[in-house]
Regions:
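Bacterial N-terminal signal peptides
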Residues: 2-12
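A short beta-turn/loop motif at secondary-structure boundaries
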Residues: 64-69, 107-110
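An amphipathic, aromatic/His-enriched active-site/gating alpha helix that lines ligand/cofactor pockets
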Residues: 19, 41-59, 78-123
Length: 129
């Protein structure tokens, strides 16, 4: 029984690490009250370009239309792999331009209240595949 569980675990984890193709990252940001415009301006004027400098491909940005989506920004990035995503985020966080932009945009208090993220791979029937 123990050997079977170990074999199943190796198979499951092995298949996760052996996935090929791009990885998509769904990110949901909640701005602090009244700061959605400032958050969007930071993306529009700086962040998207800096993402590109670190191999992060922007798929799109959305704002919810439901009332409870106020102060929310949702976007999807494409990465070559999960490892590439991790490396890109590390480089992005250490980028001097990004650090300056983040500091300037938060000088009157944080414009970001929370961040959620989910990594995804496209299904075999997805037009993205």
């Amino acid at each position: 029984m123990g050997t079977l569980l170990i074999s199943l675990a190796i198979g499951v984890f092995g298949s996760v690490s052996a996935q090929s193709g791009p990885v998509y990252e769904l990110r949901t940001y909640k701005s602090t009250p009244g700061n959605l415009d400032n958050l969007q301006a930071r993306f529009r004027n700086h962040t998207i370009r800096i993402f590109g400098n670190h191999g992060m491909e922007v798929i799109g940005f959305w704002v919810p239309t439901d009332e409870d989506g106020e102060d929310t920004l949702i976007y999807i990035l494409k990465h070559e792999s999960r490892e590439a995503a991790d490396a890109s985020w590390r480089a992005f966080g250490q980028d001097p331009e990004w650090q300056r932009v983040a500091e300037e945009s938060n000088r009157n208090g944080s414009i970001l209240a929370s961040v959620e993220r989910e990594y995804m791979t496209a299904t075999d029937y997805s037009p993205l595949k």
